[in-house]
Amino acid sequence: MMMRTVALPLSHDLNVHKIHEASGFHNSAAGKNRVYLTRTGLSSCATRQDVWSLQLLESLSGSIVPVSSRCNAFVCRSALSPGNGNEGPILKSTAVIFTRVYDALGGNPHLVKLIPAVGILAFATWGLRPLLRLARTTLFEKGNDANSQKSSTQYIVVSYLQPLLLWSGAILLCRTLDPIVLPSSAGQAIKQRLLIFARSISTVLAFSCCLSSLLQQVQKFFMETNNPADTRNMGFSFAGKAVYTAAWVAAASLFMELLGFSTQKWLTAGGLGTVLLTLAGREILTNFLSSIMIHATRPFVLNEWIQTKIGGYEVSGTVEQVGWWSPTIIRGDDREAVHIPNHQFSVNIVRNLTQKTHWRIKTHLAISHLDVSKINNIVADMRKVLSKNPQIEQQKIHRRVFLEDIDPENQALRILISCFVKTSRFEEYLCVKEAVLLDLLTVIRHHGARLATPIRTVQRMRNEAEVDTAGFSDIVFNQAAMNRRYMLIEPSYKINSDDNSKSPSPSPGQKSPSPGQKSEERDLQEEPSETKAETENNGSVPVSNAKKENQKAALGSNSNTGTKGSSTSTSDQPVAQKSEEKKKESVGDPHKAEKDEVSDDEATIEQTLKSKAKQGSEKNNGESKARDGGGSGTSSLLEENLVLGVALDGSKRTLPIDEEHKASGALMDSEELGIGSE
């Protein structure tokens, strides 16, 4: 190789000297190549020239004699500034480096062929996008636009042009390295295997990327042209994903085939592998097939409101994600994420509330039974309200307003209202329902009707004594509390002290009366005072009538002396016997004797109080009857005639009230006469 270097002087007045071929020849170290050197010094004025004059060298210097290609020469032109004279060695070393590089490239043709392949790969990897950005900035002045990454040009270059350039560079690289023969057979075999692998994977990846980008672009085009709420978008998504998956599966199969592996065995695997796949991956395979069914049939799509019941758990929410292998995600009403396996949707009922065409209004309005005369007009006006509402469906579906039934608990008149709102949105349905209910309540208020309220019956529980003494009207209708006199029971020690103070001290010849006799005498003394109090309270019973009653009581006592006398004597005998036995036992102990006397007195007092309580209840019965007869002025006449009269007349048909009343009165008279005779 011959290298020719030329140094060009510059003058201040821009006079350019043509430099011809030098007269001297300098042999190189090898003795083969000749380097022509011509040195021309610059004048003193040229040293003061501006550096800009150097840029005019090429345009003003004229033509330089070219070197023939047959000489295989490399021409290096340089402009040297005046200095210490070190320019020669630098220029010479540079020429030597270039000479060696050129000789190396010329001696090995495979390296020369690698340059375009490596250049294509480097350009596709690092130079394509900057070049596109530079062209966009130069032509459209939109280099800083944020949407440049999403432009169609960017998408085409990155999705189609870049994979093809990478594939071209890989193929050229493999073609260049294929003729190279390595010294060892093992290295040659490894080289061939690697080249086959590189060709296969580059081909599969390049065309798979282009095909997948094309499928995504087609899917995006069809989904953008349709309505976003259209359910066909889910079908396009399913088709795109299926073809996308199939493309990559085919690419993997092709890659295995290009490597020399047979994919038929993998695709038609059976026997033990199928059994293991069935047992281990049954749930995964079931979910995958169920997801295919969901995408194909589209029972629900994204952002739809569904309701289902899975394992006894109510699920209601918006569909957030429909997975292939992963579960479907439902965003609940409380904003919780519910993950449901896809195969659950194929075996359970799913309600899609978003796909509703109408929402139903169904309710009951209960009118009071007191407004039964207004029910016809109320129902008619309610029908008019629904027929005039434009948001209520009038033609396709029913519209019902009827008096459905009567509530057996409170006798309320229940009106059925059933209609459909022409909307699929739940919020709009609630607004229409609110307006309809307010209009129906306005109709009820316009007619002066009342809504029914619950009716409760409160009953008072009475004991047997109160049931015997209370009137029938008080028990069934009035349920009023009885104004009865309460009996005052004094303690036993006070009664004993009163008896001791009132009774005179017995003479030595007389015996002291027993406690039973004392109590009987006390009862006989208290009876006239009670009868006197009753006559004072009644105020209408004359003295002659009281005397006649006393005479009748005396006659009755003579007739019943044998029976009642015997009964009283028999009842008093055990008490007397017990008192005598206790006295005998307590002769030695005076304190014990006093305690025994007190206990005997208490026993006799309890018996007398029981008999007096029975007499008092009978007397209070008579007083309550008199009070009922005298208090008719306070109670209303309408209640007395309608409520009590009708109820008593109706009850006489089933209950023998008169007979029981007469029997109870006779029994009371006989008991009073018996007590008086005693």
From Swiss-Prot:
UniProt-listed GO biological process terms: chloroplast fission; monoatomic ion transmembrane transport
UniProt name for this protein: Mechanosensitive ion channel protein 3, chloroplastic
Annotated compartments: Plastid, Chloroplast membrane
Cellular component GO terms held in the UniProt record: chloroplast membrane; plastid envelope
Tissue: Widely expressed.
Species this chain originates from: Arabidopsis thaliana
Stored InterPro entries: LSM_dom_sf (IPR010920), MscS_beta-dom_sf (IPR023408), MscS_channel_2nd (IPR006685), Msl2-3_C (IPR056876), YnaI-like (IPR045042)
Designated gene of the protein: MSL3
Region (Disordered): 494-637
Role this protein plays: Mechanosensitive channel that opens in response to stretch forces in the membrane lipid bilayer. Controls plastid size, shape, and perhaps division during normal plant development by altering ion flux in response to changes in membrane tension. Acts as a component of the chloroplast division machinery.
Family, similarity comment: Belongs to the MscS (TC 1.A.23) family.
Keyword Membrane: yes
Taxonomy, superkingdom: Eukaryota
Membrane topology classification: Multi-pass membrane protein
Low complexity biased stretches: 502-517, 556-571
Ranges that cross the membrane: 104-124, 154-174, 194-214, 242-262, 266-286
Composition bias, Basic and acidic residues: 578-596, 615-628
Keywords for this protein: Chloroplast, Ion channel, Ion transport, Membrane, Phosphoprotein, Plastid, Transit peptide, Transmembrane, Transmembrane helix, Transport
Modified residues (Phosphoserine): S599
Disruption phenotype: Msl2 and msl3 double mutant shows abnormalities in the size and shape of plastids with enlarged chloroplasts containing multiple FtsZ rings.
